[in-house]
Design a protein with these regions (language model features):
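A short helix-loop-beta-strand connector motif used in the catalytic cores of GNAT acetyltransferases and
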Residues: 44-60
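Flexible loop/turn segments at secondary-structure boundaries
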Residues: 14, 67, 77-80, 129-131, ...
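Short amphipathic alpha-helix that is part of the acyltransferase structural core
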Residues: 1-46, 196-222
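Membrane-embedded alpha-helical bundles of multi-pass transporters/translocases
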Residues: 20-21, 25, 52-56, 70
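Conserved beta-hairpin
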Residues: 56-71, 160, 166-169
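Acyltransferase donor/substrate-recognition loop-hinge adjacent to the catalytic core
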Residues: 149-222
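Acyl-donor binding region in acyl/amide transferases
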Residues: 81-168
Length: 222
């Protein structure tokens, strides 16, 4: 039976959207699912402050009445203005290993992006650059971390089949923290601080950090 694409328009459908990721990876020892309620809030246009600068649409793919894929289309207007671009993002994307399903999902989000006046689609991304980004292409036998998105090996293969190309590589490293900072590193740290007039700031509470928040985010964006 053919694939049917439906836009998510109710809370019930949104929960299906969230739970599909959990169902698809059920039994996978390396996948760490998100918390359902937390994901619901993230995708809720009335609760996530990102929607002050973002637009979004969610799609579910059905076959024989069963959910077989999901995808979100997003536009971060502020990011587009900052970088003078017309980019739509795709994210929260999951699907069974089926070309018909994948094509239908991306056809839907590509059509939406064009209708919004966008000329490019990139992802997987979140609403902002502080959200999870990227698609796993190696390390499928490693437990996913809080900074990454875990996916099956067939995901990048399906993306390449459709003609999508890789933008850049991100590498993740495991670092073992010693009991104490090596003396050599302490000496180098002191030299660098004196040379550039640097100082380490210690904050007692969240309120004391706020005056520096904009500078921190500006540095991250740069």
């Amino acid at each position: 039976m053919s694939v049917v694409i439906k836009e998510v328009t109710s809370k019930k459908e949104l929960k299906k959207f969230v739970k599909f990721n959990i169902e698809l990876y059920k039994g996978n020892p390396y996948h760490v699912p998100g918390l359902i309620e937390e994901e619901m809030v993230t995708l809720d246009k009335k609760k996530n402050p990102a929607f002050e600068v973002c637009d979004a649409i969610y799609f579910l793919a059905y076959r024989d009445g069963k959910v077989v894929g999901r995808i979100a289309g997003m536009i971060n207007r502020r990011s587009n203005e900052t970088w003078n671009q017309k980019y739509a993002r795709f994210g929260f994307v999951d699907f069974i290993d089926d070309a018909e399903v994948v094509d239908a999902l991306f056809d839907a989000v590509e059509k939406w992006a064009k209708e919004q006046g966008m000329d490019a689609l990139h992802g997987p991304m979140g609403f902002t650059d502080m959200d999870h980004e990227g698609m796993l292409i190696e390390g499928f036998d490693q437990i996913g971390t809080m900074a990454t998105i875990y996916n099956y090996p067939y995901y990048p293969k399906q993306m390449e089949r459709m003609g999508y190309t890789k933008d850049q590589d991100w590498h993740e490293f495991k670092i073992y923290i010693p009991d104490g900072v090596p003396e050599k590193h302490l000496r180098i740290g002191e030299i660098v601080k004196k040379k550039y007039g640097l100082k380490v700031m210690k904050f007692k509470n969240a309120k004391s950090i706020m005056p520096y928040a904009q500078k921190v985010f500006r540095t991250l964006n740069e």
